């Protein structure tokens, strides 16, 4: 599938440039687009393909009412899928012209994508090749520091995507906020039932599999979400005290649907950039899901005008870390609608 996207040019038919990718190419693109990370791997998106454009919609049935009551995580997840789609199109030879929130009467219609022929450069190809390699790695990382040049490269990507990126210096304050969010969730029965339904899974096409969930470590510098049914061992010889990951916070000037969609796109761009550089990464959303702790992140960690939209943990995986398996995805027929002729 990756070779189809990045190594061949299917823009021509009978010697002439085609105005729109054919069905095989669209399936290849959307296969990569649906590899985007999403809240609890719910994959809360729907795609509609017509004769001249692609359309991204939310899938309200995949919203988590207890984890994500205001739908922030849903929009961020769809934004990541949108960016994955744009990257895959570019690598295949199509420039995407994205119209965000194109229908005021339908807030679930997040994007309309028109395309034109395009000659991909090596950077676009490399980014697309990172899509199937990217993993959400919740394990302990190594003591190797993330270099200033690597942080600068990620900051430049964030700026290109229209968001602000900051490295979290107030780690102790963030640690306390994360613990407060976890405590609030631990006393929310509906949340716990929902989390148990979507994590620790075996043989499902959605949700977080047990094989991708490490044992929770409350001594971690920034503790992760307490998923159900962990089945992943920590890398041998690692300890939270030696974990030298950085925490990045992405922020925007506004706090609305468009800002959240853009932040999701930027999240995708940063995660793929980290993958290209060989870095491990993991989004952190729990402290931003509760209004009180989200305000605390804004006041005590972000410390600037605007709104924090996403936290990312980035670092070097331990040399002893086993390769992570990919998380499952719903079949394309479950998330893609093909318009009639």
Q: Which role does the model predict for each range below?
A:
Residues 1-341:
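Acidic, surface-exposed loops and disordered segments
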């Amino acid at each position: 599938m990756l070779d189809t996207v990045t190594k061949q040019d299917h823009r021509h038919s009978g010697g002439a440039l085609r105005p729109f990718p054919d069905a095989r190419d669209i399936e290849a693109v959307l296969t990569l687009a649906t590899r985007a990370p999403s809240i609890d791997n719910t994959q809360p998106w729907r795609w509609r393909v017509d004769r001249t454009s692609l359309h991204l919609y939310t899938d309200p049935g995949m919203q988590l009412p207890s984890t994500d009551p205001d739908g922030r995580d849903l929009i961020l997840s769809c934004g990541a899928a949108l960016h994955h789609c744009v990257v895959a199109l570019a690598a295949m030879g199509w420039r995407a012209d994205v119209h965000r929130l194109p229908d005021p009467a339908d807030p679930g219609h997040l994007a309309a994508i028109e395309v034109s022929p395009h000659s991909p450069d090596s950077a676009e190809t490399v980014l697309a090749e990172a899509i199937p390699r990217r993993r959400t790695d919740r394990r302990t990382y190594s003591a190797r520091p993330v270099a200033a040049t690597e942080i600068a490269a990620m900051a430049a990507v964030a700026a290109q995507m229209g968001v602000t990126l900051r490295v979290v210096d107030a780690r102790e304050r963030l640690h306390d906020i994360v613990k407060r969010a976890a405590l609030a969730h631990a006393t929310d029965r509906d949340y716990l039932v929902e989390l148990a339904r979507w994590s620790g899974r075996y043989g499902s096409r959605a949700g977080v599999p047990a094989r991708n969930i490490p044992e929770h470590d409350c001594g971690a510098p920034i503790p992760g979400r307490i998923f159900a049914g962990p089945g992943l061992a920590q890398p041998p010889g690692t300890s939270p005290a030696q974990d030298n990951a950085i925490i990045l916070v992405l922020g925007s000037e506004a706090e609305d649907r468009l800002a959240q969609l853009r932040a999701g796109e930027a999240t995708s761009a940063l995660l793929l950039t980290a993958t290209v550089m060989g870095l491990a990464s993991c989004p952190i959303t729990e402290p931003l899901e509760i209004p009180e702790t989200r305000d605390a992140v804004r006041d005590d960690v972000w410390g600037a005008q605007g709104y924090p939209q996403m936290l990312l943990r980035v670092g070097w995986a331990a040399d002893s870390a086993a390769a992570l398996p990919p998380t499952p995805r719903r079949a394309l027929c479950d998330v893609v609608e093909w318009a009639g002729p």
